A protein has these predicted regions:
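Conserved AMP-binding/adenylation subdomain of ANL enzymes
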Residues: 195-212, 220-260, 275
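Gly/Ser/Thr-rich phosphate-binding loop
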Residues: 259-263, 273-336, 349
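Conserved AMP-binding A3 loop
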Residues: 36-38, 172-196
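A short helix-loop-beta submotif of the ANL/AMP-binding
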Residues: 61, 67-95, 103-109, 211-212, ...
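Conserved pre-ATP/AMP-binding loop-to-beta segment of ANL
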Residues: 9, 24, 157-176, 182-183, ...
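Structural core segment of the AMP-binding/adenylate-forming
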Residues: 53-54, 81-153, 466-468
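Conserved AMP-binding/adenylate-forming core of the ANL superfamily
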Residues: 3-11, 16, 24-69, 73-77, ...
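AMP-binding/adenylate-forming catalytic core of the ANL superfamily
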Residues: 93, 110-112, 262, 356, ...
């Protein structure tokens, strides 16, 4: 290794250094499969060698379509070790939606989880650039389907770590955002950006070597992958992985594994509190609770703190493009600043600006912009959107917010009407375009409305063509045939007209105010 590379810090370096410090400590566990850091590191380097033997080169995109598993975590570091670029794909997307991502990023290899066989078989016809499909189910004793390579084959080669040739500024992953346009954007994140974000989480979210994490939210999301799994591995924590987010399974694992650290959107926390098992579960080990993707209702927060008196809560706000954590509301501020996103984390600088780029006054609404080494390098193959996002030298988040006299940021709206439902991002425009395919539709506006379970529920407000009748069931069934399940509206509201401003723009905020109580009953 030459002197120029001695200080190089890539994702595989974080695992290698942890392994040197804690070789025999539990790193990854799922069901009865337990790996120490030494086991985990050795497996990662062997899989890296296996990928290279298949012809995957540094810079190639390696996609993964899988639910949570220990093999997912293994693939994450193996791809990094050989210089590949990981592209996690949301397993809830339908085949056409997933194919767009795979074709756009020009993935050469697709890692397929045990529950995604049907989708993968459709993708083989839709994505001609994919040269190899690797069956992760072989790690759980499942027979390998025809035309797929068993994951076990990747473990049979020589170990490979391309640290000497890796540059921390090179891409480590591309995560596709649920953009406000119909086509998602691929956020390219370098090794360095992700590791800068790890540092922010280690400091501001107080992630430590003694933590035992339960990873139940999807690892295809950068929240679970990069705000919790990655920082935990870097510092040497223990990581329990599950693909079953049901309240009963989560409560059982929280008790049996003595989980100390748990992240979930408010919808999951609410489901845990409402489970008949909750009162019977020993949660005495649970010291740190994290939430994000939506605001935690104050009454729910109080109930969590009353039911688990030793727990401390953090609210994490951010987005894929900043790897992902931008601000954190600390435990001592949860009830003092309810609804706030907190203050910028260690390696992020944030402002709230008006339309001409000036800081807004205290209490005034403006757009959140960031400057940080955590930020994406670019939107993949999209220089125009990249330039727009960094207009003025700051990254434009698209979120509207206020800032108070203590510097606390509160998100008040999403500039482009993104809906966050159950922790998933949904583009209102994408759902609108699906509904507009129905011939009886005159106008439609898709909004998120408060919901006791989903926090925000996708809701379509529809105006039909004159003289036409349309049922809620028909619209929902139509959407279900062309959209992923989490994007399908929970309710269709029929109205005579949509509110507009003087320039003719639909006033979605007025719609949200008018129909705010639809899901109360």
């Amino acid at each position: 290794m030459n002197a120029a590379n001695v200080s190089c810090q890539t994702l595989i370096d974080t695992l290698r250094r942890t392994t040197a410090r804690h070789p025999d400590k539990l790193a990854i566990k799922q069901h009865d499969q337990c790996w120490t850091y030494q086991d985990f590191y050795q497996r990662c380097t062997r899989v890296a060698g296996g990928l290279s033997e298949l012809g995957i080169k540094p810079g190639d995109r390696v996609a993964i379509l899988s639910r949570n598993s220990s093999t997912f975590a293994l693939a994450r570091y193996a791809v990094a070790a050989m210089g590949g670029v990981l592209v996690p794909v949301n397993f809830m997307l339908n085949a056409n939606e997933a194919a767009y991502i795979l074709n756009h990023c020009e993935a050469r290899l697709l890692l397929v989880g045990k529950d995604e066989l049907s989708n993968a078989q459709q993708l083989s016809a839709l994505c001609p650039a994919i040269e190899h499909m690797v069956w992760m189910g072989s790690e759980e004793g499942l027979a390998t389907p025809e035309k797929m390579t068993p994951f076990a084959d990747l473990l049979s080669g020589d170990a490979l770590v391309a640290t000497d040739s890796l540059d921390a500024a090179l891409p480590a992953q591309i995560i596709y955002t649920s953009g406000t346009e119909s086509a998602p954007k691929g956020a390219v994140l370098s090794h360095a950006a992700i590791i800068w974000q790890y540092a922010s989480c280690l400091v501001d979210a107080e992630i430590t070597v003694s933590d035992v994490h339960l990873h139940s939210m999807p690892l295809y999301h950068c929240a679970q992958l990069d705000a919790f799994l990655g920082p935990s591995v870097q510092v040497g924590g223990s990581n329990i992985i599950t693909d079953d987010p049901s309240p009963e399974n989560l409560l059982a694992l929280l008790e049996s594994e003595s989980i100390s650290t748990f992240f979930a959107p408010p919808t999951i926390w609410i489901a845990l509190l409402n489970s008949p098992m909750f009162a019977k579960t020993d949660l005495s080990a649970l010291r740190k609770g994290y939430y994000g993707a939506a605001i935690m209702p104050v009454e729910i927060m109080k109930k969590i703190q009353q039911s688990i008196p030793q727990i401390r809560l953090w609210n994490l706000y951010g987005q894929t493009e900043i790897a992902p954590v931008a601000t954190i509301l600390q435990p001592e501020d949860q009830l003092r600043k309810p609804g706030s996103a907190g203050k910028p984390v260690l390696n992020v600088e944030s402002r709230i600006i008006d339309d001409v780029g000036n800081d807004v006054a205290v209490g005034e609404i403006g757009e959140v912009v960031h400057r940080s080494p955590q930020l994406l390098s670019e939107y993949f193959k999209d220089p125009e959107r990249t330039a727009q996002a960094f207009d003025g030298g700051w990254f434009h988040s698209g979120d509207l917010a206020t800032i108070d006299d203590e510097g606390y940021i509160t998100i008040v709206d999403r500039k482009k009407d993104m809906i966050k439902t159950g922790g998933e991002n949904v583009s209102g425009r994408e759902v609108e375009e699906a509904i507009y395919q129905l011939p009886d539709i005159a106008e439609v506006a898709v909004i998120g409305l408060p919901h006791p379970r989903w926090i925000e529920a996708v809701t379509a407000v529809v105006v039909t063509q004159a003289g036409e009748s349309l049922t809620e069931e028909l619209v929902i069934d139509h959407c279900a045939t062309i959209l992923a399940g989490f994007k399908v509206p929970k309710k269709i509201l029929f109205v005579d007209e949509l509110p507009r401003n003087p320039s003719g723009k639909i006033l979605k905020r007025d719609l949200r105010d008018t129909h705010a109580n639809v899901f109360d009953s």
